Amino acid sequence: MISSKASDYQQRIGYVFTDPSLLLQALRHCSAGTPHNERLEFLGDSVVNLLIAEALFQRWPRADEGALTRARSELVRETSLASIARTMQLGEQLILGPGELKSGGHRRDSILADAVEAVIAAIYLDADLATCRTVVLPWFETALTALPVGKPEKDPKTRLQEWLQARQWSLPVYELIFESGDPHTKHFRVSCTLGELKLRTEGEGSSRRLAEQDAASHAIDQLDSNK
């Protein structure tokens, strides 16, 4: 049976489930036992990529494949999904095991992003793709509107590399500081070092690639603040 808290939360996300157990599963992290949300996360990843690709294809009729791909990547990346989760106060609804709860898992980007994908899959399974589209796309509307039409911002690693190359400086060096977690809940910390500038930043993410992007983003922020 769904709790009154979870029942109220359906109003916040804009969808009332026919089968509330799907929502409960979407909110349950693997640390809290089964049935957890990993399978839903897998499906939701594909569903959200389809919905965003479709929306961009329709909104940007003259954009080439590269621009569409970069825009989709920007909208569905971990930090973007985590931001949506925070807007919807999803972290407060998550069902976590004692360890994750104690370590603040309800605030971690990777867990929040995975939960958003799981909720999207739950809506898709409970209803259909058309309903899922109607419910989910408004979550992305602010980010969609903010993207420069046909020319979405490049990812942080690319932007940092191009900035350094324009000044004929050495490329950044990324190094793994540590990785933790089991195969399904990996967490990485990576450093980004800019030799000539004597600048070193760190980033975190659920994959090494995401951690490097986060470190590059922090480096860009430092460079911008020093202008």
Curated annotation (Swiss-Prot):
Residues 155-225 form the DRBM domain. The active site is at D45, E117. Its EC number is 3.1.26.3. It is an enzyme of class 3 (hydrolase). It is found in: Cytoplasm. Its cofactor is Mg(2+). Keywords: Cytoplasm, Endonuclease, Hydrolase, Magnesium, Metal-binding, mRNA processing, Nuclease, RNA-binding, rRNA processing, rRNA-binding, tRNA processing. GO terms for biological process: mRNA processing; regulation of gene expression; rRNA processing; tRNA processing. Mg(2+) binds at E41, D114, E117. One of its GO terms (molecular function) is metal ion binding. Residues 203-212 have a biased composition (Basic and acidic residues). Residues 6-128 form the RNase III domain. InterPro entries: dsRBD_dom (IPR014720), RNase_III (IPR011907), RNase_III_dom (IPR000999), RNase_III_sf (IPR036389). CDD domains: DSRM_RNAse_III_family, RIBOc. It catalyses: Endonucleolytic cleavage to 5'-phosphomonoester. Its main location: cytoplasm. GO terms for cellular component: cytoplasm. Residues 203-227 are annotated as: Disordered. Homodimer. NCBIfam families: RNaseIII. Belongs to the ribonuclease III family. Digests double-stranded RNA. Involved in the processing of primary rRNA transcript to yield the immediate precursors to the large and small rRNAs (23S and 16S). Processes some mRNAs, and tRNAs when they are encoded in the rRNA operon. Processes pre-crRNA and tracrRNA of type II CRISPR loci if present in the organism. This is Ribonuclease 3. It comes from Xylella fastidiosa (strain 9a5c). The lineage of its organism: Bacteria, Pseudomonadati, Pseudomonadota, Gammaproteobacteria, Lysobacterales. The gene is rnc.
